[in-house]
Structures are given as structure tokens and as C-alpha cells.
UniProtKB/Swiss-Prot annotation:
Main subcellular location of this protein, as a coarse class: membrane
Function description: Involved in cell fusion during mating by stabilizing the plasma membrane fusion event.
UniProt feature, compositional bias: Low complexity: 655-667
Keyword Transcription in annotation: no
This protein's encoding gene: PRM1
One GO cellular component term noted in the UniProt record for this chain: mating projection tip
Taxonomic lineage of the native organism: Eukaryota, Fungi, Dikarya, Ascomycota, Pezizomycotina
Sugar-bearing residue positions: 252, 263, 281, 307, 491, 497, 567
Subcellular location: Cell membrane
All ranges on the Extracellular side of the membrane: 1-60, 165-326, 435-604
UniProt-recorded name of the protein: Plasma membrane fusion protein PRM1
Family: Belongs to the PRM1 family.
Membrane-topology annotation of the record: Multi-pass membrane protein
Sorted UniProt keywords: Cell membrane, Conjugation, Glycoprotein, Membrane, Transmembrane, Transmembrane helix
Amino acid sequence: MFYNEKTGAVPPVPSNLNANTWHTVDLQPAPQLQPHAHTAPTVTPYLGLRARLSQLWFNRWTILLILVLVRVLILTAGLNDNIGDAKTKALSACTKVEDIGSAMASMPHYLSVGVNSMAADGITKTVSGMVKMLMMILTGVENLILFIINMYVGTYACLIAALIHGGLDVSVKVVEGATKVMNDAIGTITGQITESISDVQDAINKIPDTISSFLGGVDFDLPKIDITKNLDDLENIKINSNELVRDIVALNKTIPTFDQVENFTKNAIAIPFNFLKEQVNSSFGSYKFDDSVFPVAEKQALSFCSNNSFLNDFFETLFNVVRTAKIAFCVAIPILAVLAIVGMGYLEIQRWRREKQRSREFTERGYDPMDVVYLSSRPVTGGFGLWLSAKFKSVKKQLLVRWTIAYGTSLPALFVLSLAFAGLFSCLCQFIILRSIQKEAPALANQVGDFAGDVVGTLQQVSTNWADDANGVIIKLQDDINDDMFGWVSNATTAVNDTLNTFDDEIDKAITAVFKDTILFNTARNLVGCLITRKIETVQEGLTWVHDNAHVTLPLFANDVFSQGANNSVNGDSDLTSFLASPSSVTTDEITSAVNQVITKLEHGIVQEALISTALLLVYVIVVLSGAVRALVASAQKEKTRGEGGEQYGVKAPGSRGSSSASSGNSDNHHYHHHHDNSAPSDFDRKGVIYAGSVKRGRPGPERWPSHARKSSYPEVEGPDH
């Protein structure tokens, strides 16, 4: 029995009336076990094993996993709605891009009409200018040829005429001079002959006289030489120079002037040129190209959204990803919940067995009631605290370590920690879904990036088809011009060559007719051949070159006439920010932004939940750190001695003996320890530490003494039953 001095109880019996000395009094008597109500094995005021196992299906971890599953289901439902909205926006944006692309791909249809008109007008003016230029060239060439022929013919006709006339004049002068000399010579010779004959006649006349005198006067007559008449006849001979040069004078009058050759050549050369001019004028004089023969590019209706199932397939893939993730989590999380139920069931069975064992130990021995309650309610964390505290030798540190573990594993702290883990696990599940969606997003971006390429490819194809058809028309016109106009030029050059050959033949005939039987024939022929024929051959070579190269090559349309600008824009040559100039910033932003919004929204939700879960985890860490700091501070405080009112922390484990007073030598009497039975040691004995009294704080309560003990100044030492 105990009493309180302040309540007016009967004071204790003085010590001098006690048979034993105070040394024999056990200041810490064995605790008196309190009787408890009788309980049947099947009817108890507490939950038995079956009752506890019946509540395993809604244990803490299962409930948290179910909450995570509910969060995932809510997320997938929201994702399906968001993906549906994104699909609608993407299809709308894709349709807009499709309309823009169709309009751009149809631009050749509208541009080709103007290009055809411009090309037709250019061809008309080109042909008209070519006709005018050809007419001027033909006229110029014709007159140039005639000028050269006239120059050659006139020059050499004058040279030949001068040569002939000069030769004839020389011949006439020579004949006249020779005739005069001969006539003068005949008169002189006749006079000299007459004088000589007169002298001879005088001599002959003296001969008879001499002979007569010599013969004595015989007279005889000698015949007289009379040649006077003959000399008169000889003197009367006159050479007429006119008769001698009559043929030469007649030849001089018959020298040709080549007018016939010139006129013939002029008429012959004019024939092909006039024919060519008439053909050119009749065919291309009023030429106008018909632009209707040019093709018109067809309109293009791009359908990379309408007929292309990529977008639908992409979003169906996203729906399938969400559906698969939903099914996976609906399967995995319940499995984890079942495993949690199984694990918690196993732990509950172990806890039940451990509680039954400890209840017997707690019943058979005296322990700190609070420690008993704690170890009974928290066997796992309490056991972990016992295991960890056994590593320290100081009893106080052992108590503080156990207190720290108990503080950090209290129900509120573990509730915060479980919420943090559940939130992080939920974020992990959402992150898995996010990564699955992000993995599919680049495929959409790549496909959208190809839309611009599809437009440019269509433009290129349309441009190529139109250019091929238009170039076919131009090539046909080019062939017509080469076959008609320049074919006539070829014919004209051939005719001119033939005419020049005829001209050469006519000149040769004229020279032959004039100089055939004269000594000037070869000279005149060689002179004309050197000065005229070789020049004609040179002109013929030029006409042959014209004949071989008389064709025109019209410029053709390039295959990228309508797509070059678009292609340059896609390749980055344009500074414009347009569908083609920057497809990544326009097309991708228009279409993929819908998916990016879903991803961004999901990311923001994950980040928010992760921050909340991290905040809860930090709260738990702060709680643990505050408990650890409090334990460290308590461990560092200087302890009071027992005489100063200090506290005794705990007792030795059951079965271990405390040392007795050295002076008494009686091992059965202890001042501060209980007598305990050494039988049936528990796991607490092996750990070397048990319960321990609580560290006192606050205002101390009234002191108590046993009714059989005298009042003493020693403070009462609390036993484990207090």
C-alpha cells in the first residue's frame, strides 16, 4: 500500500519498530500482477486472428494501390477526351493545310494560261521578227551576190575589152607603120634602081662608040634597057594598111561586153530568192501562234488528310496506347493489391503470433506499461528499434535510438510517407503513359513535315507534265520552221550554187566564143579563172555552210518552271515565313500542337503531383530529422547523479543479475533491482535490452513510499509498473 503525505494518510511505521534493518528492505518490490477479466478463446474484447485477416482486403497498401488505380483510370478517361479533342483539332488543321496545299498545287492550272499566252505572243513576235530578218537577209544576200557578180563581170569585162582593144590598136599601128615603111622603101628603091639603070644605060650607050672607034668606025646599035615602065609599076605599088587591119578592126567591133551573161545570171539568181521570199511571205508573213495548242495544267486536289489514314491511325494508336496502359494498370495494380493483401496477411499472422508470445511474457514479468503498449501495437517498428538499439552500449542511447525509430515510424508519419509513395507511384504510372505517347509523337511530326514535300512533289509533277506537253508543241513548231522556212533556205542555197555554176559555165562559154581562135584565149581563160571562178567557189562554200546550218532551236520550258520557287522555299532559300518556307514552324505547329497540348497538360499534371508527393516526402523527412535532432540533443545533455535527483534508465533484462552492495555481500538483496526468474528467456533477453522507463519531463508528481517503509529523503525510483 502507498499513501500520500498530502492527503492526510497514516504515516508509515518507524523503522526502529521494524524487525529488519532498512538494508533488508527491497525498495523495488516485485510488481503485483493485477487480475484481468476472464476471456474465452472465441469471445474476446480484442480482434483475433480471423477478425484481423477478414480486414486484410482494405489494408493501407491495398487502399493506396486502389487509389492509385482510380487516379490512373481518371487520367486515362481524361486522356481519351483530350486525345479526342486533339484529333479534332489536328484533322481541322490538316484539312486547312490540305486546302492550302491543293491551292498551291493548282497554281500551275491558273498560271499556265498566262504562261501559254505569254509564250504564244513571244513565239509570234519571234517568228515575225525572224521572217523580217530572213527577208532582209535574202534581199541583202541576193543583192550582195549580184553586186559581186556585177563587180566581177563588169571589172573583168572592162579588163578583157581593154586588153583586146589595146591589142588590136597595137596591131593596127604596127601594120600601118610597116605599110608606110614598105611604101617609102619601094619608092626609094625604085628611084635608086632608075638611077642605077640610067648609069648602066649611059655606060652601055658609050660602048658602041668605043667599039666603033676601036673597030674603025663600025657602027652597030646595042639594045637599050628600058625598065622605066616596070619601075613605074613598082613605084606605083602601095600597101594599104586598112586592108591589113580590116579583120582586126572588125574583131575590135565584135568584142562582147558580158551584158548577156550578167542579165542571165541576175535572172537565174533572182529565181530562188524570189521563190523563197514568196514562200516565206505566204507561210509566215502574217503568222500568229495559236496559244490554244498549248496544254493547260490540271487542277490538283491533294488528299493527304482525306484519303490518308495516317492521322486516324496515329490517334487510334494513341487511344490504343492509353487503352493498353489502362488495361495493364487495371491488371497490375490489382495484382499488386492482392500481393499486398497476401503480404499483409503474412505479416498479420506473424504479428499475431508475436503478440501472443509477448503477451505471455508481459503477463509473467513486469514491464514498463507504455513500452508494453508500444511493442504490442507496433511490433515491426518496435522490433526494429530493439535490433538497432542493441548496437549501442549506453542504456540512454539505446532508449533514444528506440525513441527516434518510434518517432519516425509513428502512424501520422507513416501515413504521410505512404501518401508520398502512393503519389510518386501514381506519377510513375502516369509517366509511363506519357512516355508511350511521346514515343508516338515524332511519327506525327515526321509525317506532317512531309506534307510540304508532298505539295512540292505534286507541283514538280504537274510542272513536269505541263512542260513536257508544252515543249512538245514548241518542238513541233521548231520542226515546222526548220522544214519549211529553213528548208526553203536550203533549197535556195542549192539553187544559188547551181546558178553560180551556170554563171561560171556561161563566162567560160563567152570567153571561148571570143578568144577561141586567138592567141589571147588561154590568157583570158586563166585570168577569168583566177579572178572570178575562185571567188565564186568561195561564195559556194559559204552557201554550203548556210545550207548545212540553216535551222533554228527554240528555247524550251524547264521542268521546274512552276515548282522552283516552292522547292527553294522548302530548302530554306526564302526569307518568308510561310507554309513552304518554314514547314516545321507552320505545319508542325498547326497539327502537332494538338498532340503537344495533350502531352504538355499531362506533363504539368505529373509535375504537380510529383511536387505534392515530394513535399509530403519532405515533410516526413523533416519529421524524421526533427526526431533525430531531438534525440541527439538529449544524448548530448549532461546527466545528473542519483544523489542530485537523476534518473535511472531502465533495468537489466530478465535473467541477468545486478551487482549487490559490496559491503553487504548478500546477493539476494538489491536496493534498486528486482528478483526475476531465469526460466523461459525471451528474444528481449537475447537482445540485452528491454522496455526502459520513460524519460521524465515536466513538473514532478508527489513522492510515494511503501506503507512499511519509513519516509526518506531518497526519491522514489519508478519501477516498470509505473
